[in-house]
Amino acid sequence: MIASIHFDPPVIAHRGASALAPENTMSAFLRAVQLGIKWVEFDVMLAGCGTPIIFHDETLNRTTSGRGNVAEYSYAYLRTLDAGAWFSPLYAGERIPSLEEMAQFLVATGLRANVEIKPLPGQDEQTVVAAWNVMSAYFPEDSPQILYSSFSVPSLKCLRHLAPTSLMALLMHEWDPKWLQIAETLQCVSIDVNQDILDPERVREIKNSKRLLLSYTVNNPDRAEQLFSWGVDAVFSDNPDQIARFC
């Protein structure tokens, strides 16, 4: 079941190198490349017009100069917002990327990506279809460069229908005793788990299923070392350079 996915170093830049640059922006992803990180993670949701964009929150308030719900605005408007000044004046003028822009960046750099499908309420399937329409124009269905993940089982079901050979991961924030049943049904090659709910027994349980085990969000090198010693394959981190230094 384990896919032909390799993590060297075993760290994934969470929303890019988001401790060093504003999360889910091209500057954060470029910073990851500059640090020698091979994998990034980012979130995909839909703007009000249906364009898939790279953004995490349902609202604009935390990470942009805008206010209100993402779903209320077209991408043409969202593109005018400042997505960097909240982090540092050095990043003033940073824009919200589209998934298309990100896909082109992945092709140009060879960077690998964990693409988290993060649908707004009621958009589980719609988000997958829009995201797949973009990604399939740039990558083969079974590309080892791309791992799709989601907390949304309906989204994963939709993706499996659209792309039978795509590499998928089930995200778990709280422990779900039915995780194996879900993973087998959806043919997930990886389980991506909140580090706070992991212990050696649960790590063994997942690894015994012959799947990859990724853990988030790990910013402490000592904690990363512990997780690796238990058998975790890679960790998501806001400061991937610090984790990679100890790998």
Predicted features along the sequence, with ranges:
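Phosphate-group recognition and catalysis centered on beta-loop-alpha active-site segments
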Residues: 1-247
